[in-house]
Every structure is written in structure tokens, then in C-alpha cells.
Amino acid sequence: MVLSDKELFAINKKAVEQGFNVKPRLNYNTVSGVNGPLVILEKVKFPRYNEIVNLTLPDGTVRQGQVLEIRGDRAIVQVFEGTSGIDVKKTTVEFTGESLRIPVSEDMLGRIFDGSGRPIDNGPKVFAEDYLDINGSPINPYARIYPEEMISTGVSAIDTMNSIARGQKIPIFSASGLPHNEIAAQICRQAGLVRPTKDVHDGHEENFSIVFAAMGVNLETARFFKQDFEENGSLERTSLFLNLANDPTIERIITPRLALTTAEYLAYQTERHVLTILTDMSSYADALREVSAAREEVPGRRGYPGYMYTDLSTIYERAGRVEGRNGSITQIPILTMPNDDITHPIPDLTGYITEGQIFVDRQLHNKGIYPPINVLPSLSRLMKSAIGEGMTRKDHGDVSNQLYAKYAIGKDAAAMKAVVGEEALSIEDKLSLEFLEKFEKTFITQGAYEDRTVFESLDQAWSLLRIYPKEMLNRISPKILDEFYDRARDDADEDEEDPDTRSSGKKKDASQEESLI
């Protein structure tokens, strides 16, 4: 069979196009300028958005970058390792034709990586079971499953009043100088799945894992996280990504995406329940602003790019559950509010995308309360689907509502006391003040290494609510009140047994032992 010239041309054209698609490997020496973290290249053929490029410096050093923008035959590349030392005339750029992918494997658990996904724990390279695009695969909205069932953190203020459902995304709003890093480390140590019975709570199940990504942290904070995870054994089920403050700012843009790609592999291919903690998202937003300024884009609020809402959603929306997969991704991003301003663009836009917030309060911190979580501005929008009979306990919802109501009333009573004095307060106001003090000192206050199950937290909540007579607990249904109020009283009476009675009981037991001898 003889092919015509036209047919041969078509076959050759198709082969060339396929060759470019598979592995073009085009090299250029056409760098025309460097602007901040960006490199501008001229006369580029077939550039692609998000394509990975390798830049070879005159000294032989190779750095990775990503095509950020294409204007005709001009390509703008952001360099992950920074642009210092790049010579415009002597730097060679290679276009790979591929997007940024990360090698993933179950062996990533127990390992520590830098912000670009390279191991920094003196261990071997990860033996890849798959290579995944760090931007993730789009999830069909119809295939998403509503987040249900609870993830326990071991922190009473979260588990009892702001319960987190598997597949939920709920940020922690903090500020400079507050112990959000300690809270994050405590959650990593204690987090697990909740069993529906009081006497069985296995927080370290084989199908529960944690992916932790830190962006822009200093050396002291990075050392704290590594030591804490290693000493408490939580590193075995954790994959840790660390982008330090002295690392290139641009690297912070890919660090959370590397972490989430790892989480997606563990959740959807190995069917684990994955808790992903990202800190600090403010550093990520500042990196976005730096790139936007280098590209000379029109700035939005406070200099941040106008597309920051869309960009943040590409991170937060990767949490969830998918039909046909038993795993889930639960996200807890942590951000520091500049000047404690909750209306700042970063917390403001984050609040629009996520499903609630956990608020770390400076006033509680100044009182010496740890963790200083203020439950009044905190909210978990998916809490109702994570609690109740069969998941935690049937009294959970009513107890949470009653604690919120009494704590708010206690705050009002404290404000009134500051104006009129304690003598002018009613008996109910004095009860509210007593509840306020005990709530903050015994319920919210918790040791950094104190792990409370959700059932222990609920029992402690009932012991606080017993300050009030039954008729004043109007947020709890009569049936729940009859079942749990007296039970809480009986438990408290047993704990407050007379010490003289206990000592006489011990003497009686000792005399019985002597008579037996």
C-alpha cells in the first residue's frame, strides 16, 4: 500500500505532536529578565500553563519552576527555590511538558519532608506507588458525601461544643503570640476516630492518619513539631511537610498542595481517614501577594490579589468524602489574624469557604487559660451530623446548647458585676458567675498532654450544669434531663466521698487481712 504525500504528512504531524506531548524537552537560553521570584523567557514554543521547567544555572545548580503565565511566545515562570544567582545570559531553561507531580506511597507516613517534598530526615527517597498532580483531580459534586461521624481531638472545647465531622474543613483563627502551634501539636497527638461506646475509644486506629504542613515557620517552631511528634509516637502515623521562614517564599505556594495530594492518596486509594493540618495560611497568602506584586497585577484589598478567594478555595475544597471510597479528608487550616483583626481579608475569605471556625482568644490567654479557645465566636456548621446517639451520645446536642447559653449569660453577669457590684446581683446572676469561673477553669482549661474522650468531656459538662437546679436548664429536653442530671449527681457524690469514711474503710480492710493471717 502506497501512501500519498498528504497522508504521510498527516502521519508525521501526528507523530511530532505526540512526541511533544509525551516528552518535548525543549531547551532555551532566552531569559530576558528576572523580577522577584519570576523569570521571563522570550521566543518560547508550545508553552503550557502550569508546565514544569528546569533552570540550570552557570554553576550547574538545577532549580525547578512553573509556568505561571503565557503571552504569545513569552512565558513567565515562578521559580520555587528563588531567583538569586540566576544569570540572564548563561541560564538554560528546559521545558519538561509535565505538570508538577509528587511521588506518593504509604511509606510517606513517619517521614519528614521540606516544602518541596524532598526528604529531610536522613531517610531514603520515597519508593513511589504512584505519581500524582499536586493540583488534584476535580471531584464531581454529585459524588461527594455529606460529612458525618466525628473526629475526636481530645480537647473538650472542640469535641463537646464545636465537634468536627469527618470530611469537614474548619479553620483555627489565632493571632501572633497565641499558642496555636501547641494546640496543633496536641490535636496531632490525640486525634482519632470516635467509637460509639463509652468504654472503647481507640484514637490510634490503623486507618487514621495525619498530614501536617507548616509554612513559613521559624527553626524553633519546626524543631518543636519534629521533637513533639517523635517523642510522643504520633510521627508513625504522620507525614510532615516543613517550609521554613528562611526557605524561598514562593515554595509556600506548593507546600499545602503537596500535603493535600498526599492526603488524597491516603484517603481515596488506601481508604484511610486523614486529618490535614495546614499552618500558617497567612504565610501562604503573603506568598500569593508577593507573586501578584511581581506580576504587576492590580491589587485587591490590602494589596492581596483579587483572585485570592478562588485560590484559597482550590485548597480548602479538597477536603471531603467521595462516594465509593471509605476514606475521608478533614482539614484544619490555621491562620494568624494580623492585629487580631477578624475582618482582615485572609480570615474573612477563609470564613466564606470553610464550615465554621475555632477562635483562639487573647483575653483567655492572658488569664493563663490553656487552650484559650473562646467558644462563643467559635462555630462548627456540620456539628449536628457528627454527634448524637450512635455516633457520640444522645445528650451531646442538648448539653452543647445549654453550655453555650449559660456561658453567654455568665459573661453578661460578669459585665453587670463590673458596673453595679456583686451586692446588687440576683441569686441567678451569682450562679451564672460561679458557672463562668468553673467553666473556664475546669472545662476549657486542660493540660497540653491531657487527652479527654468526648464522653469524659460530656460527664464533666454535666457536673458543671448541676450548679443550676433542673428547672433552670431550659435548653435540655425533660427526658434527657431526667436521665443524665441525677446520674451526674450520683457520680459526683461518689467522687466526693468523706475522707474519714475512706480512711476508716482502709483500717477495716487492714484488720480483716490481719485476722486472716
UniProtKB/Swiss-Prot annotation:
It holds the Pfam family ATP-synt_VA_C. Its main location: membrane. One of its GO terms (biological process) is endosomal lumen acidification. GO terms for cellular component: cytoplasm; cytoplasmic stress granule; fungal-type vacuole membrane; Golgi membrane; membrane raft; proton-transporting V-type ATPase complex; vacuolar proton-transporting V-type ATPase complex; vacuolar proton-transporting V-type ATPase, V1 domain. InterPro entries: ATP-synt_VA_C, ATPase_a/bsu_AS, ATPase_F1/V1/A1_a/bsu_N, ATPase_F1/V1/A1_a/bsu_nucl-bd, ATPase_V1-cplx_bsu, P-loop_NTPase, V-ATPase_su_B/beta. There is a cross-link at K14, K508 (Glycyl lysine isopeptide (Lys-Gly) (interchain with G-Cter in ubiquitin)). The modification Phosphoserine is found at S4, S137, S503, S504, S511, S515. It is a peripheral membrane protein. It comes from the Eukaryota. Residues 500-511 have a biased composition (Basic and acidic residues). Coiled coil: none annotated. The keyword Protein biosynthesis does not apply. Residues 487-517 are annotated as: Disordered. It is found in: Vacuole membrane. Keywords: ATP-binding, Hydrogen ion transport, Ion transport, Isopeptide bond, Membrane, Nucleotide-binding, Phosphoprotein, Transport, Ubl conjugation, Vacuole. ATP binds at R381. One of its GO terms (molecular function) is proton-transporting ATPase activity, rotational mechanism. Belongs to the ATPase alpha/beta chains family. HAMAP family: ATP_synth_B_arch. Present with 131000 molecules/cell in log phase SD medium. V-ATPase is a heteromultimeric enzyme composed of a peripheral catalytic V1 complex (components A to H) attached to an integral membrane V0 proton pore complex (components: a, c, c', c'', d, e, f and VOA1). Interacts with RAV1 and RAV2 components of the RAVE complex, which are essential for the stability and assembly of V-ATPase. Non-catalytic subunit of the V1 complex of vacuolar(H+)-ATPase (V-ATPase), a multisubunit enzyme composed of a peripheral complex (V1) that hydrolyzes ATP and a membrane integral complex (V0) that translocates protons. V-ATPase is responsible for acidifying and maintaining the pH of intracellular compartments. This is V-type proton ATPase subunit B.
